[in-house]
Amino acid sequence: MLVAELTSPHQFQVTDVPPVADPEPGQIQVAVKAVGVCGSDLHYFSEGGIGDARCLYPMVLGHEPAGVVVKTGPGVSGWAAGDRAVLEPALYCYHCELCMTGHHNVCANIRFMSMPAEPGFFRELVNLPAQNLLPLPKNLSDAEGALVEPLAVIVHSMHLATPRPGETALVFGAGPIGLLTVAMLKLSGIRRIWSVEPVGARRELARVMGADAVIDPSAADPVHEVLRDTSGRGVDIAIDCAAQRDTINQCLHAARNAGRVVVTGIPAQDHVSLAFHIMRRKELTFYSVRRSNHDSETALRLLESEPKRFAPVLTHQRSLSEIQTAFELCASYSDGVGKMTIRL
């Protein structure tokens, strides 16, 4: 089977390796058909790691997959060869304190496929526990199915942000996560959404996804613009999907008193300095997002019921053999790329 391995910074190698073994009891073997390129994949590609997680080469990335069932292991029911599925990359222990109290996303023993030492989905075949598959509705393409994992992260972030109809929101970053965040905020009834993004094509995509105003941070100070537009009040919710330079602190400055700040993006550096006294004086509620917490089924239902709301983020597709140039395009923000999907 073909597998794409990141062998060093900026370098993929596609090789033919022996196929995976037959699925064990409780497992399903799946032929991977589409995998979205995540911002964290790009961190590994461009920077050799993300935050304090460093690459262990060779490394198989990709954790936003959809595929087709090939065969089932002993004891599996409800699935048959040919069934289309969304695949969940998180492998929880289900018995630690955190799992037992509903915090599966921070499971003490979690294994997340595409992390160092846990191969991801840029490969043709994979065996997964049966509970890690969800049926892919007929009205969704494989590429749309690959949106479930990132959209589930946004659903989780919305549980933290608690958007209410009539409120205002600011979103830093209009990459795929930022774009999906804008769409979910609009769906939640947010009255006005500002999107901050330096890349022109992505600002236009943000408008398509539901942003009411877009700001180029290289041309204007986002905090000044938002405070001016809100007569000094600030926004109810500030969400950082970029975590670049000083965007987290800009969220603190742009949020209203007693507002909510949510950080979905992942900073490249190990330590981030916060304008704590701004946060303290405003009594802001501050959330950091760790993936999703059993939100995939909700995300799938949203995609099934409103595919046109989320589909514009899907701008590019490439084959597995083209993964090198696909990542180079994404890393350079070229050609108006939003979400890149790798086809298998």
Locations of regions flagged by a protein language model:
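Glycine-rich cofactor phosphate-binding loops and adjacent beta1-alpha1 units
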Residues: 161-164, 204-285
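Rossmann-fold dehydrogenase core element
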Residues: 260-262, 274-313
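Glycine-rich beta-strand-centered segment in the early N-terminal region that forms part
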Residues: 21-35, 50-97, 134-139
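N-terminal glycine-rich cofactor-binding segment
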Residues: 3-22, 39-71, 86, 107-119
